[in-house]
Regions:
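Alpha-helix/helix-capping structural signal
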Residues: 16-19, 50, 88
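A short acidic, helix-capping loop that chelates divalent metal ions and anchors anionic groups
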Residues: 20-23, 55
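Acidic, PIN/NYN-like endoribonuclease modules and their adjacent C-terminal/linker elements
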Residues: 72, 76-106
Length: 106
């Protein structure tokens, strides 16, 4: 199922996700190449009015950390499924569809 998702859609990430990926301290040279290729192939959602307002709503209602709230807001504002290994922080958000890629085949 995960490969179907990956192969069927262009990846989309929040600007926060891009920053987090590029700040990975232990990334090898190969990791950096893969990360840069992934980012190049992705739509990177910048902060805009819609994402800003949704972030404020999420922060107030669910008390998420700002980066997680921006990531969730980016997915919601663009009607995307959030793919993350950090499901616990996101599964309480109303209308946000969350998939843990490491649990798809379990």
């Amino acid at each position: 199922m995960m490969s179907d998702i990956i192969n069927s859609y262009q990846p989309a990430i929040s600007i926060i996700t891009e920053i987090e990926l590029l700040c990975w301290k232990t990334a090898t040279e190969n990791d950096v190449v893969v990360i840069n290729d992934f980012i190049s192939d992705s739509v990177v959602y910048q902060l805009n009015q819609s994402i800003k307002l949704k972030t404020i709503e999420i922060r107030k209602k669910y008390r998420l950390k700002l980066p997680d709230a921006i990531i969730a807001a980016s997915a919601l504002a663009n009607n995307h499924i959030l793919i993350t290994n950090n499901v616990a922080d996101f599964d309480k958000i109303y209308k946000l569809k969350v998939i843990d890629p490491f649990r798809l085949n379990k």
